[in-house]
Amino acid sequence: MADSSFDIVSKVDRQEVDNALNQAAKELATRFDFRGTDTKIAWKGDEAVELTSSTEERVKAAVDVFKEKLIRRDISLKAFEAGEPQASGKTYKVTGALKQGISSENAKKITKLIRDAGPKNVKTQIQGDEVRVTSKKRDDLQAVIAMLKKADLDVALQFVNYR
């Protein structure tokens, strides 16, 4: 029997993030407590979101609204990293970045976790910004997926190419 495998990746569906951003922008435009604060949310480049408002409290609340919309769209908050509010003139601004890809540090943590706690006949390979897990038994692969979902890692994980 051939080996079964799957890949562990950390990718965010940009269209879902765009939908969450548009929903947050709509809510910020219509909510009573944001009236007159000139609160806005927009893309800044390809992988960053910029929120601006007239007060520090309102910009923090806008970040919370955006995070709420990300959760509703099934996007892990581990994939979004918001910065601190910065004063710029009469407005406050927060820039948040989307984190994609598994860093080499996190890939090493994942492979070590699988080696230490996972089934014994499971092999891992680091391939750029993803990790491939192979085994002869599919049950072992499913056990690895369950273990990684329970593990507290600081990166959002998706499991793709399950064969």
UniProtKB/Swiss-Prot annotation:
InterPro entries: DUF520, UPF0234-like_C, UPF0234_N, YajQ-like_sf. It comes from Mycobacterium tuberculosis (strain ATCC 25618 / H37Rv). One of its GO terms (molecular function) is nucleotide binding. Belongs to the YajQ family. Nucleotide-binding protein. This is Nucleotide-binding protein Rv0566c. Keywords: Nucleotide-binding. CDD domains: YajQ_like (cd11740). GO terms for cellular component: cytosol; plasma membrane. Pfam families: DUF520.
